[in-house]
Amino acid sequence: MRTMNRYFSSALFALIALVLIATPAQSAPVGGDNEVEAAAGFNHAQGSDSGAFNVDLQFGRYLTPGWELGIRQALNYNFIDHGSDSWVATTTPFLVYNFHFNDYVIPFLGLNAGIAYNDRDIVGTFGPNAGVKIFLSDQTYLGLRYRYEWYFNSLNQADNNADHGNHVATIGIGFVWGGARKTTN
């Protein structure tokens, strides 16, 4: 446990240092931009003492500077002592709104819905997500994300399972390209 605390403390220190030394970039996404992000983090099943390692890969397209439509592929892997490890993959389209308060820190809120599957079952999943994109250069950002996922076999069951989902937090690096940026000379 002590090693894990040291790891988290080091990661938090590195993240804070990265944010503090980063040169603010004038790089807010514009309509027509594409975005790709790779992220890793942790997944915690609500009401349990277990968690899992999480890896995300996502692609998004900015419909406007605010609205982004995309798809996320995620893999949650649970390492179990004295038992079989387990995994759950999710494929979820998402729609988020990016708030442009300035050009280098872009918070967002959104929804995702799709399927969750493993080697035994396929179910539906949906939930809210939120986070912030901190631009480190014109086209590169640090992404901090949180999402809640709940699962259902039918839409009638979705309401009953709202408090039996997963909390997923990730940190990743993303790239934005394309779009119609105005150039200044």
Tell what function each PLM region has.
Residues 2-12:
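Bacterial N-terminal signal peptides that target proteins for export
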Residues 11-21:
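Bacterial N-terminal signal peptides
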Residues 23-63, 68-69, 73-77, 166-185:
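Short glycine/proline- and aromatic-enriched beta-strand/turn motifs that initiate or cap beta-hairpins
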Residues 33-38, 106-112, 152:
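Flexible, solvent-exposed coil segments and beta strand-coil junctions
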Residues 58-129, 134-140, 177:
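Gram-negative (and chloroplast) outer-membrane scaffold detector with strong preference
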Residues 76-81, 134-185:
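Predominantly the C-terminal beta-signal and adjacent terminal strand-loop region
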